[in-house]
């Protein structure tokens, strides 16, 4: 008899898991999504290191239209827009497994198109979860019910399902920062390298710009701000003026910082949670939300989906605990680096900035350090 699985949330992690399970005749699955449809028109960019590309290649990612992706070869570091040094990203590549950037919507479309449309149920908000005779019974607000063997919660950073299951509020924590995003044509980028990933560190802020396909660059600006300032930044006119001043942007950015400017507050998780119900699994941001300073959000969702797929196929009866322990250990590694980067990127003291830049130049040339600090993340 097939094992029945319900996936709550059609994000990167949930869709990756669905693709892996779809190849296995031992599973029957259904994806429940609270939105009316998948958002495939958004321009948010994602970065995928080898640890995630190798998994996606198992489901045909190496055959994706090359115009929809980009393979940057270097990571360039700047301090107040003055180049410090660069890192060769190709040292982590293996054959067709290359560091890749693309629109998040392009990744979602790739994952969705490989699945049968009849496994999706939209406009579904979970209302109740309980166990009945070794089965997990789920009930939605519209009255629809289902009984499954496994429940995968993959509904994002603001996961309400986790709080519902655990009977406790697990809302993420505001980290005192706000992000802004624009896109601009690659050929309009002048002071940065439009073919590679650029990180420009500034006082209490940093800017990241990288190509997301053959024609477009994604520009993300992150600044520290308290709650009062965060509220003021909801006003688009004030926000445009603020980021131009904070990031000291050159004139090439002017026409793209307009009323279409996207912005959002940054959140992180407290600690990973072992589900109190066996055969329930938290995936992606529902498991743990990282700071964006390691660019591993999507990659870790994909990696976790692969881990869970393998655990679902083994004979261990305590699968929830096995998955939790494995994922928590990996999360600890990624989180420590993300937090350190976030701290170091935002130095404002002139002396600290000087020594940070000096140390960074030396560390980039140290292959043992690079392999330990980045290799352990980029290659799993």
What kind of region is each of these model predictions?
Residues 22-42:
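Glycine-rich FAD pyrophosphate-binding loop
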Residues 5, 22, 49-165, 170-183, ...:
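Conserved N-terminal helical subregion
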Residues 6-24, 152-153, 180, 236-238, ...:
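Conserved mid-domain beta->alpha element of the FAD-binding
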Residues 358-380:
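C-terminal auxiliary extensions adjacent to catalytic cores
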Residues 37-55:
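Conserved N-terminal glycine-rich FAD pyrophosphate-binding loop of Rossmann-like flavoproteins
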Residues 85-99, 103-109, 187-262:
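Conserved FAD/dinucleotide-binding core of flavoprotein oxidoreductases
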């Amino acid at each position: 008899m097939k094992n029945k699985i319900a996936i709550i949330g059609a994000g990167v992690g949930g869709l990756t898991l669905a693709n892996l399970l779809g190849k296995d005749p031992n599973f029957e699955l259904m994806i429940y999504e609270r939105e009316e449809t998948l958002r495939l028109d958004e321009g948010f960019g994602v970065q995928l290191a080898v640890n995630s590309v190798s998994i996606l290649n198992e489901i045909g990612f190496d055959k994706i239209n090359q115009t929809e992706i980009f393979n940057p070869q270097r990571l360039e570091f700047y301090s107040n827009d003055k180049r410090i040094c660069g890192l060769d990203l190709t040292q982590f590549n293996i054959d067709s497994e290359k560091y890749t950037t693309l629109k998040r919507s392009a990744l979602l479309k790739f994952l969705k198109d490989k699945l049968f449309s009849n496994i999706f149920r939209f406009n579904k908000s979970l209302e109740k979860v309980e166990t009945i005779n070794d089965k997990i019974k789920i009930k939605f607000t519209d009255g629809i019910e289902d009984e499954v063997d496994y429940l995968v919660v993959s509904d994002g950073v603001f996961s309400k399902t986790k709080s519902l299951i655990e009977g406790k509020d697990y809302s993420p924590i505001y980290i005192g920062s706000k992000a802004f995003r624009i896109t601009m044509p690659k050929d309009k980028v002048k002071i940065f390298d439009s073919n590679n990933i650029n990180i420009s560190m500034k006082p209490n802020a940093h800017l990241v710009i990288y190509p997301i396909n053959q024609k477009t660059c994604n520009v993300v600006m992150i600044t520290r701000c308290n709650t009062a300032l965060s509220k003021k930044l909801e006003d688009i006119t004030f926000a445009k003026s603020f980021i131009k001043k904070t990031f000291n942007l050159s004139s090439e950015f002017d026409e793209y910082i307009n009323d279409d400017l996207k912005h959002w507050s940054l959140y992180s998780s407290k600690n990973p949670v072992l589900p109190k119900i066996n055969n329930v699994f938290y995936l992606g941001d529902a498991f743990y939300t990282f700071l964006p300073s390691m660019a591993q959000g999507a990659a870790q969702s994909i990696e976790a989906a692969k881990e869970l797929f393998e655990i679902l196929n083994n004979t261990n009866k305590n699968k929830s605990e096995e998955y939790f322990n494995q994922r928590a250990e990996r999360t600890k590694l990624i989180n420590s680096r993300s937090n350190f980067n976030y701290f170091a990127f935002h130095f404002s003291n002139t002396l600290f900035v000087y020594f940070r830049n000096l140390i960074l130049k030396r560390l980039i040339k140290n292959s043992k350090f690079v392999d330990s600090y980045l290799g352990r993340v980029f290659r799993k």
